[in-house]
Amino acid sequence: MESERPDAHFHDPFARKLAGAKGDEIVRTLKDGTSMAWAMIVRTQVFDEIIMAEVGTDGIDLVLNLAAGLDARPWRLALPQSLQWVDVDLPDILRYKLETLGDAKPHCSYEAVEADLTDATVRRELFARIGARSKRVLILTEGLLIYLTDADVAALATDLLAIPSFTRWVIDLASPRLLKMMTRSWGKAMASGNAPFKFAPPSGTDFFRELGWAERAYHSTMEEAERLDREMKMMWLWKFIGRFYPARMREEFRRMSGIVVLERI
């Protein structure tokens, strides 16, 4: 785990406890699970940095974390006490997380909302309630969109845009090329768990522009991995081969995977 490295970028004292034996089993049995952990490390660190920057300098007063899963950022990040943080996920997931965290105290105001985000009525009512109590909201959908259809993502984007205080939205985004690679490696395993990979729009972030959300910042996973010294094995070979590709192809590789900050237009 990243937290246990001497040069760790982040320290999550709750990660191993939350992951439990099931988490170890997934990493052990999933093809290339350990060797591909670099991408999750990079994503986590970049999300951390974006959150701290948005909260610290851009006046965000509430973070809405959709499909929050086992994310323990309210407990491990040095967030201001005045910040409101709302986790949304299915009941079993949130209850397991809170029971596992036990007496640990979050650094900010924290609320766990049990909700099925696939229910449009429930989703819209939740967004309206959150929007009414905040001035500037940062939305997080870390690790979520890739499991949704284009129509699902479009509906979510539309519902988020309907709330004036929802100003920024942080996503992770895959390209069609990466989706094919991931499907070849892990597609059967993910499909057997009822979580097939789906969303990787050919138009990239333009998909969201058409829905009222513009790209504010794009953090290439490959570039961030180099910055953080967490590159995948054989990346040097990818870089060498890339020198011989035209600029258009190099840009396609750069945007194969990224963390994106969107803002309402």
Summary of predicted features, one role per range:
Residues 112, 120-124, 147-165:
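A short, conserved alpha-helix within the catalytic core of class I
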Residues 214-240:
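Conserved catalytic loop of SAM-dependent methyltransferase domains
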